[in-house]
UniProtKB/Swiss-Prot annotation:
InterPro entries: AAA+_ATPase, ABC_transporter-like_ATP-bd, ABC_transporter-like_CS, ABC_transpr_MalK-like, ABC_transpr_MalK/UgpC-like, Mo/tungstate-bd_C_term_dom, NA-bd_OB-fold, OB_MalK-like. Belongs to the ABC transporter superfamily. sn-glycerol-3-phosphate importer (TC 3.A.1.1.3) family. Its EC number is 7.6.2.10. ATP binds at G35, P36, S37, G38, C39, G40, K41, S42. Keywords: ATP-binding, Cell inner membrane, Cell membrane, Membrane, Nucleotide-binding, Sugar transport, Translocase, Transport. The keyword Membrane applies. This is sn-glycerol-3-phosphate import ATP-binding protein UgpC. The gene is ugpC. Residues 2-233 form the ABC transporter domain.
Length: 372
């Protein structure tokens, strides 16, 4: 549906914001571009919209090349972070403005606006000016203005950044429900990994103008392609410990464990990744055992974050574990167990080392847990 081929964007100062990106997006798919500031996500979005000229490459929409067309001719609607509403116009006139410029009849405009206003629950605001609306109401109007155009593609440029935390959570749900209802292909830009995980059919993780990984939320969370993806997706972020592997055995702080990797794999320097929520306080089968020296405990209500030090291959390293709420003493050592199937190994280039030969016992237990 949307096909981006070898997209390059270089600015006049010589900065290359996008470095040969290839991305194919399917009809009706909700794609989220995520990454830190300067990763190229906004440059890609603005290039799709036609707000910035690309340096090289091609952009195709529904089989038609559009990168050489004016923005108004691309059949794309964009929702901005700052809403981009006309302050002197009523909500109705803001919704109608683009349709009037395209020569749509008053009757058709009224019909479209009535339908969109009902869908977004903004009927009672149609006579108000934007200044009389809350942030969430303005964002609904901004989305309504995009919807009435009936475009082939929606673009969202960090639309929730100006809202408070509670309203962001509510609007995330509204956007997801609306996109499912309309079935319009959508590309959404954010630096917030929670938005990416909750909204996306697929996530595109960007780093310094290049795609680091494309996958479903589950794939980028459970099978991160690199330490960058592993640290960016997930909150709290993944723990990283220096380790090594010899003949398929993980070596860490004088201990070793059999792990489901190539038996011939030998690596003096690798990174072991453990998600904080995968630390179990109870012994489990097929697991490695570690010990956290507790330094800080952050209570969060139903659970808590335990910050401490863990004995790694080259000395003490920072570690965070998510545990159930319980009394803990600063300075104590807290034993934890992590299933080998939940371990992540990364090589010297910080790329994921794939599991190659899981033991039947691990596979069986995984299947049993999935069936529960």
């Amino acid at each position: 549906m949307l096909d981006i081929q070898q997209l390059v964007k270089t600015y006049e100062n010589g900065h290359q914001a996008v470095k040969g990106v290839d991305l194919a997006i399917h009809q009706g798919e909700f794609i989220v571009l995520v990454g830190p500031s300067g990763c190229g996500k906004s440059s890609i979005l603005r290039s799709i919209a036609g707000l910035e000229a690309i340096t090289s490459g091609e952009i195709h929409l529904a089989g038609r090349r559009v990168d050489n067309e004016k923005p108004a001719n691309r059949d794309i609607a964009m929702v901005f972070q700052n809403y981009a509403l006309y302050p002197h116009m009523s909500v109705y006139d803001n919704l109608a403005y683009g349709l009037k410029n395209r020569g749509v009849s008053k009757a058709t405009i009224a019909e479209k606006i009535a339908k969109v206003a009902k869908t977004l629950k903004i009927e009672e605001y149609l006579d108000r000016k934007p200044a009389k609306l809350s942030g969430g109401q303005r964002q609904r109007v901004a989305m309504g203005r995009a919807i009435v155009r009936d475009p082939q593609l929606f673009l969202f440029d960090e639309p929730l950044s100006n809202l408070d935390a509670a309203l962001r959570a509510h609007m995330r749900l509204e956007i997801k429900k609306l996109q499912r209802e309309l079935g319009v292909t959508s590309v959404y830009v954010t630096h917030d990994q929670v938005e990416a995980m909750t909204l996306a059919d697929r996530i595109v993780v960007l780093k310094q103008g290049e795609i680091e990984q494309i996958g479903t939320p589950a794939e980028v969370y459970h099978q991160p392609a690199s330490t960058f993806v592993a640290s960016f997706i997930g909150s709290p972020a993944m723990n990283f410990l220096a380790a090594s592997i010899r003949d398929g055995k993980l070596q860490l702080a004088g201990k070793q464990w059999s792990v489901p990797y190539d038996a011939n794999l030998n690596c003096n320097t690798l990174t072991l990744g453990i998600r904080p929520e995968h630390a179990s306080l109870q012994p489990v089968d097929d697991a490695i055992e570690l010990s956290i020296n507790i330094q800080v405990v952050e209570p969060l209500g139903p659970n808590q974050l335990v910050h401490g030090k863990i004995n790694g291959e080259y000395g003490d390293e920072d570690f965070i574990a998510v545990t159930a709420e319980m009394p803990l003493t600063i300075g104590d050592n807290l034993p934890i167990w992590v299933r080998v199937e939940q371990l992540h190994l990364f090589d010297e280039q910080e790329k994921r080392i794939p599991i190659s030969a899981q033991s039947p016992s691990v596979d069986t237990r995984q299947q049993q847990r999935q069936q529960q």
